[in-house]
């Protein structure tokens, strides 16, 4: 095992060990503690008249403590913003919340939006709830371990905004809604006076798996929905780009819980698929209700290898993929087919060729389609036999960081369409050395060290009369 892999699992092991040791406090069991923190939070309820607010307008704000792995508070300032956004279609008002992480000595001309994957149909799994101190790692392990990478981004001096991109109805898979929520989270972050970002601040975004699906929609809608944002790059990997194909592929496999969450999420906001919930069998009602209270891993464990899209769970399920109305509805969530929805900023896409959760071919086809329509795309194939969906999500992080740095620094892009193939990013010695330091840094961050650009770097820049 390579040193960086050891550090990754050591970091995660530390998180789990510390949390496991804290699951009983004064004789109170973990489920009892969790129940105490599941009360209704009035912050999520917008004030009267909110519907008339502009997309991205801040409706409420609060300062919060964040603990990404549910262990210690991060040494940063953090705020949560309730903001107005748009649902599936233009003019459909809704709200969401973004958690804004502000490191010390931060750059006021850079903001990075991180689309963490929830991949669930439960309100308790939203990043704003999981990042806020007081929630437990057992509720949403996915958000907890993804947030370890956030400290690396914060050490760059970037403001990082983390939206609840599924919205208040937890609409996992409802791409346009999620894209709107991401773009409006950036608007809200820039609009929030307490941070003081410039109106023309450079914007980048990153998402993997379900987060990439949401980010792909943000990239596609940027030009038509939020063209005033100075977006300089998007990074996404393991991306679902054709919803019907993915549901057909994943249902009945070990990832069947994704199908439950996605169909539940989309049908909760899309009138064209409301009939799915209206026609649930008694067993289907039980499964969907459980999904409403389960984060990703719990949902996957409980629904593994079940065929949810069948008459066993809802009437019409067995002929769902032959139903023209259902296919019309799901095809609205395909990326790369609409020439009016093409990313205008450079896009770094990456995918493991042997990904068994999200088929490689669909992501590659979308990348090529975007390229043919004038987008600037780098689609990197991780071709090593050991690279799958989970390993690619971790191994790609140094490549993602380099891309984001280059975009913020204005590095020349090169050829419009690029299709590099690498066996395995683990073998990139440049990445290996940098990552070793970064993961050690992250362990220190979890122990409460102050996070931001190091003061000696700040002083050196000031001495040279450079902008910090």
Curated annotation (Swiss-Prot):
Any GO MF annotation of the entry: triacylglycerol lipase activity
Residue pairs linked by disulfide bridges in the UniProt entry: 125-295
Protease among keywords: no
Signal peptide as annotated in the record: 1-21
Coiled-coil zones: none
The keyword Protein biosynthesis belongs to this UniProt entry's keyword annotation: no
GO cellular component: extracellular region
InterPro entries: AB_hydrolase_fold, Lipase_secreted
The reaction(s) this protein catalyses: a triacylglycerol + H2O = a diacylglycerol + a fatty acid + H(+); a monoacylglycerol + H2O = glycerol + a fatty acid + H(+); a diacylglycerol + H2O = a monoacylglycerol + a fatty acid + H(+)
Keywords in alphabetical order: Cell wall, Disulfide bond, Hydrolase, Lipid degradation, Lipid metabolism, Secreted, Signal, Virulence
Location in the cell: Secreted; Secreted, Cell wall
Active-site residues (renumbered): 209 (nucleophile), 355, 389
Superkingdom of the source species: Eukaryota
One BP annotation, GO: lipid catabolic process
Short name of any one Pfam family annotated for the protein: LIP
Enzyme nomenclature, EC number: 3.1.1.-, 3.1.1.3
Functional note: Secreted lipase involved in Dandruff and seborrheic dermatitis (D/SD) probably via lipase-mediated breakdown of sebaceous lipids and release of irritating free fatty acids. Has triacylglycerol lipase activity and is able to hydrolyze triolein. Mostly converts monoolein to di- and triolein, while free fatty acids are only produced in low amounts.
Family, per entry: Belongs to the AB hydrolase superfamily. Lipase family. Class Lip subfamily.
Protein name per UniProt: Secreted triacylglycerol lipase LIP7
């Amino acid at each position: 095992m390579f040193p960086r892999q050891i550090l990754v699992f050591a970091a995660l092991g530390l998180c789990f060990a510390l949390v496991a040791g804290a699951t009983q406090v004064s004789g109170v069991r973990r489920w009892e503690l969790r129940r105490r923190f599941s009360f209704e939070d009035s912050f999520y309820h917008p004030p009267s008249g909110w519907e008339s607010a502009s997309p991205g307008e801040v409706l409420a704000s609060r300062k919060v403590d964040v603990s990404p792995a549910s262990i210690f508070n991060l040494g940063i300032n953090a705020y949560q913003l309730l903001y107005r956004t748009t649902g599936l279609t233009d003019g459909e008002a809704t709200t969401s919340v973004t958690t804004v992480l502000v490191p010390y000595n931060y750059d006021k001309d850079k903001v990075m939006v991180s689309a963490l994957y929830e991949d669930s149909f439960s309100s308790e799994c939203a990043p704003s709830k999981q990042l806020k101190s007081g929630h437990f790692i057992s509720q949403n392990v996915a958000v907890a371990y993804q947030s370890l990478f956030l400290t690396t981004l914060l050490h760059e001096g970037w403001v990082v905004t983390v939206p609840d991109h599924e919205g208040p109805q937890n609409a996992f898979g409802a791409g346009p809604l999620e894209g709107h929520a991401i773009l409006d989270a950036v608007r809200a972050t820039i609009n929030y006076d307490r941070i003081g970002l410039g109106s023309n601040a450079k914007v980048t975004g990153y998402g993997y798996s379900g987060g990439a699906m949401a980010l792909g929609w943000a990239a596609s809608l940027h030009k038509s929905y939020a063209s005033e944002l100075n977006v300089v790059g998007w990074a996404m990997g393991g991306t679902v780009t054709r919803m019907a194909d993915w549901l057909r592929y994943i249902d009945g496999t070990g990832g069947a819980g994704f199908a439950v969450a996605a169909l539940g999420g989309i049908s909760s906001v899309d009138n064209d698929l409301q009939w799915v919930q209206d026609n649930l069998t008694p067993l289907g009602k039980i499964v969907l209700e459980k999904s409403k209270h389960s984060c990703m891993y719990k949902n996957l464990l409980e629904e593994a290898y079940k065929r949810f899209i069948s008459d066993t769970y809802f009437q019409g399920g067995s002929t769902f993929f032959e139903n023209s109305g259902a296919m019309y509805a799901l095809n609205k969530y395909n990326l790369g087919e609409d020439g009016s929805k093409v990313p205008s900023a450079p896009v770094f896409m990456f995918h493991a060729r042997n990904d068994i959760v999200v088929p490689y071919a669909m992501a590659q086809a979308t990348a090529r389609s975007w390229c043919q329509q004038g987008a600037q795309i780098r689609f990197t194939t991780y071709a090593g036999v050991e690279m799958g969906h989970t390993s690619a999500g971790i191994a790609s992080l140094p490549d993602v960081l380099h891309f984001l740095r280059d975009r913020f620094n204005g590095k020349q892009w090169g050829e419009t369409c690029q299709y590099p193939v690498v066996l395995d990013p683990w073998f990139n010695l440049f990445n290996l050395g940098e990552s070793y330091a970064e993961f050690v840094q992250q362990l220190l961050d979890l122990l409460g060290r102050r996070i931001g650009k190091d003061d000696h770097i700040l002083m050196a820049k000031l001495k040279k009369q450079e902008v910090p």
